[in-house]
Design a protein with these regions (language model features):
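N-terminal glycine-rich phosphate-binding loop for ADP-containing cofactors
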Residues: 1-183
C-alpha cells in the first residue's frame, strides 16, 4: 500500500527520532549512542550520529517534518517533532559534512563532538559499557543481541527500550502497508 515517506524512511526516521528523545531521557552522549548503535549490533561503523552527519541533518529534518505533517494518526506522531537541540543545529546551519560540522566537527587533526546539552563542541570521550565488553568474543550479531538486551547497565537499558519501541512500531505498520503479510 502507498504510505507517506515510504516504509523504510518511516521506520528509519522513527528509529532516529526515538533515539534523539532517548538520548535526553537517559543522559547519553553522542559517542555513547554511536558506540551502542554501530558494529556491535551489525550496523556500519558510522552508527547513528555520524550517519546523520553524512546524509545531512537537513535531509533528516525534511523527512521527519513530512511524516509529522502527513501521518497525523500515527501513534508516534509527537515523536516526529524535532527535539530542541536539532532545531538549534538547523538554526546554526550545523548540517553535518556538507557544512563542516554537525554532531561531529573536525578541527585540524582533532574530531570534536557536540555536547547535546550545551551545544558546544568538546573533545571526544571514549564510550565504554560493561555489557559491550561481554560481547567482544561473540561473532554472530544474533548471539551478541541476546547478551546486549540482558545487560545490567545503561547499555542494557538502552537496548531494551530502543528495540522494544522499534519492534512495536514496525509491527504496528504492517496493516498500514499490506493486507497480506505472508505473500
Amino acid at each position: 500500500k502507498d504510505t507517506p515517506a515510504f516504509i523504510g524512511n518511516r521506520i528509519g526516521i522513527f528509529g532516529i527520532q526515538s533515539l534523539f528523545h532517548q538520548v535526553k531521557e537517559m543522559g547519553l552522549t553522542v559517542e555513547e549512542v554511536d558506540k551502542l548503535t554501530g558494529p556491535v549490533i551489525g550496523r556500519p561503523k558510522s552508527a547513528t550520529f555520524r550517519t546523520v552527519d553524512v546524509v545531512g541533518l537537513d535531509t533528516l529534518v525534511h523527512v521527519a517534518n513530512g511524516i509529522y505533517e502527513n501521518c497525523p494518526n500515527d501513534e508516534a506522531h509527537e515523536l516526529f517533532k524535532l527535539p530542541e537541540f536539532v532545531n538549534k543545529m538547523m538554526e546554526n546551519k550545523w548540517l553535518g559534512s556538507k557544512t563542516g560540522q554537525g554532531f561531529y566537527k573536525k578541527e585540524g587533526k582533532d574530531i570534536l563532538t557536540l555536547d547535546l546539552d550545551t551545544l558546544e563542541y568538546r573533545a571526544n570521550k571514549k564510550a565504554s559499557f560493561a555489557t559491550l565488553e561481554l560481547t567482544k568474543t561473540i561473532e554472530k550479531p544474533i548471539d551478541r543481541f541476546k547478551v546486549l538486551v540482558t545487560g545490567k547497565d545503561k547499555a542494557g537499558d538502552f537496548y531494551r527500550k530502543n528495540f522494544a519501541s522499534m519492534f512495536q512500531y514496525c509491527s504496528n505498520r504492517i496493516p498500514e502497508i499490506t493486507d497480506a503479510f505472508y505473500k
